[in-house]
């Protein structure tokens, strides 16, 4: 696809006429936009809800504050939503000038190890302008299916363990990590992050450690502990994280609760034994119980080349409800 059109449309119009900074006390228009597709927009909403204040231009709207057609978080990474339009909801696509203006705005705000992520069609729209302006990618992941967990009477975990009763100890051990267990959780989180993104996040300073601690404090980091050898940890015995999953994004939207799982990880020596599936099924139930309600949506996204993970999710009944893309910088 050619993005030369960005150069030809509206270059004489000031960028400020295309983008509207969203103050932290005037988010209702953006939230209404996101409510049209809460599963796809939950990452953007998470950022706006986590921070009570932000700098001018950290959140921007396209099309005005009251009824924007698109919006984006632009601090270190870029999270766009709505650029490609949502005709089923009567929303037009952002025009070429608006998309170029967003790319120009975000370009100087992207960090060395940031990303552009969100619905694949929205990422594709803005990435063309960014690349034209000289932004280079470390890795492009254009097919990341968004999957949603099924609603199962009696709970997904219980239904799964009826098929795998030998793993009952796993499902029964799933719980939110405690603050005094942060030192146990952090190495597992770092291993997951390093394997997924290719570098140790702790080398960039204390930010990642703070994020892991924050998730634990919010009761959004779920773990299974074992004795280090794939057996239930007994009182007084050594303990290790066998499995973990985080609620990376969370929103109680007008149409119901939505959670997005991130950081799903099974310790390498335990993979292929069914432990990950048993634990994840129990996590889905726990997230509904603790955060989004019985009818809430629990979703995640996965690289399409991660065949083992896709097989695991589908074995539990997860179904595709969207498509994300991530461009790593």
Q: What are the residue ranges of the model-derived segments?
A:
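Short amphipathic alpha-helix that is part of the acyltransferase structural core
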Residues: 1-44, 158-202
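Acyl-donor-binding surface of acyltransferase catalytic domains
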Residues: 2-8, 67-68, 75-170, 327
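Conserved donor-binding loop and adjoining core beta-sheet/short helix segment
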Residues: 12-15, 21-22, 32-38, 46-115, ...
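Acetyl-CoA-dependent GNAT
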Residues: 73-79, 198, 206-262, 267
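Conserved acetyl-CoA-binding loop-helix of GNAT-fold acetyltransferases
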Residues: 92-105, 262-268, 272-289, 310-315
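Conserved GNAT acetyl-CoA-binding A-motif
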Residues: 110-120, 257, 287-302, 324
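Conserved beta-strand-loop-alpha-helix junction that forms the acyl-donor binding cleft
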Residues: 117-123, 268, 298-310, 327-329
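Conserved active-site alpha-helix within GNAT-family acetyltransferase domains
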Residues: 121-140, 277, 304-322
């Amino acid at each position: 696809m050619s993005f030369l059109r960005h150069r030809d449309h509206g270059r004489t119009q000031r960028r400020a006429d295309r983008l509207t900074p969203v103050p932290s006390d005037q988010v209702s228009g953006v939230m209404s936009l996101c409510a049209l597709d809460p599963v796809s927009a939950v990452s953007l909403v998470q950022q706006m809800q986590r921070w009570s204040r932000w700098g001018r231009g950290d959140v921007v709207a396209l099309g005005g504050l009251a009824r924007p057609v698109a919006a984006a978080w632009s601090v270190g990474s870029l999270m766009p939503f709505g650029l490609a339009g949502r005709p089923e909801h009567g929303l037009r696509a952002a025009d070429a000038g608006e998309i170029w203006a967003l790319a120009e705005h975000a370009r100087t705000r992207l960090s060395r190890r940031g990303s552009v992520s969100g619905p694949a069609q929205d990422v594709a729209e803005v990435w063309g302008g960014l690349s034209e302006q000289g932004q280079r990618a470390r890795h492009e992941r254009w097919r990341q299916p968004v999957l949603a967990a099924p609603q199962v009477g009696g709970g997904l975990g219980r239904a799964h363990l009826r098929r795998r009763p030998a793993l009952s100890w796993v499902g029964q051990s799933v719980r939110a990590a405690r603050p005094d267990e942060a030192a146990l959780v952090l190495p597992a989180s770092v291993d997951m992050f390093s394997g997924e993104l290719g570098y140790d996040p702790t080398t960039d300073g204390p930010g990642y450690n703070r994020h892991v601690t924050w998730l634990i404090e919010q009761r959004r980091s779920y773990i299974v502990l074992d004795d280090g050898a794939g057996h239930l940890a007994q009182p007084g015995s050594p303990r290790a994280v066998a499995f973990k999953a985080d609620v990376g994004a969370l929103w109680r939207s007008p149409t119901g609760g939505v959670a997005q799982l991130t950081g799903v990880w099974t310790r390498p020596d335990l993979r292929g034994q069914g432990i990950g599936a048993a634990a994840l099924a129990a996590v889905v139930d726990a997230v509904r119980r603790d955060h989004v309600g019985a009818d809430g949506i629990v979703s995640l996204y996965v690289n399409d080349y991660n065949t083992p993970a896709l097989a695991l999710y589908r074995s539990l009944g997860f179904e595709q409800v969207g498509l994300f893309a991530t461009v790593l910088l």
